[in-house]
């Protein structure tokens, strides 16, 4: 949240699926940043300690999500959707967008690739919210394929991290030019 606030709300803070009280605290922090949207992971994948909290963090019901989304007061993005049923529940809860994500394939390596589930999810959503997708997007061709399969936009992280660590701003520019 500090980085988003320091950049006049440019950025989308992402919260974990904590208990209701912690989420309310996090939403207050998000509102203070001036962020134009907020995201929440729909699961605690890769963070097993979250499930050991009392009360445990993790999956939320449609009703719980409705309350969280209403409290956010900015467009709300649900990340980690991997099924048509999950996408329909996100829409029912009032999400502005979903992110089809298997958390980079390194945390949930037993689940399908995002490109495999994207067409079915796009059909289920049927334009009722924006569909973002991540996971394995590395080239302009990958971006094109994701858009052709039903995504409204793609998210790319690891290649940008590698580019900035390898060559700073110039590395990022080279990567963008190659896209």
Where are these regions (language model features)?
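N-terminal capping/small domains of soluble enzymes
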Residues: 1-19
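Alpha/beta enzyme core
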Residues: 7, 18-133, 140-164
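Internal helix-turn-beta structural module
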Residues: 152, 166-179
């Amino acid at each position: 949240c500090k980085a988003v606030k320091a950049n006049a709300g440019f950025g989308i803070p992402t919260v974990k699926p904590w208990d209701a009280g912690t989420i309310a605290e996090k939403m207050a922090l998000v509102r203070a940043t001036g962020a134009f949207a907020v995201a929440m992971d729909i699961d605690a994948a890769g963070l097993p300690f979250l499930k050991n909290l009392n009360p445990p963090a993790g999956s939320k019901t449609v009703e719980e999500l409705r309350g969280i989304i209403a409290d956010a007061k900015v467009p709300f993005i649900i990340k980690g959707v991997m099924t048509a049923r999950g996408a329909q529940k996100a829409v029912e809860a009032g999400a502005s967008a979903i992110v089809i994500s298997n958390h980079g394939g390194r945390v949930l390596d037993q689940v399908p690739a995002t490109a495999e589930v994207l067409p079915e999810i796009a059909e289920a959503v049927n334009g009722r919210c924006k569909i973002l997708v991540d996971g394995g997007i590395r080239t302009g061709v990958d971006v094109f394929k994701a858009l052709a399969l039903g995504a409204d936009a793609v998210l790319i992280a690891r290649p940008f991290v590698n580019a900035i660590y390898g060559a700073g701003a110039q590395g990022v520019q080279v990567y963008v030019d190659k896209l």
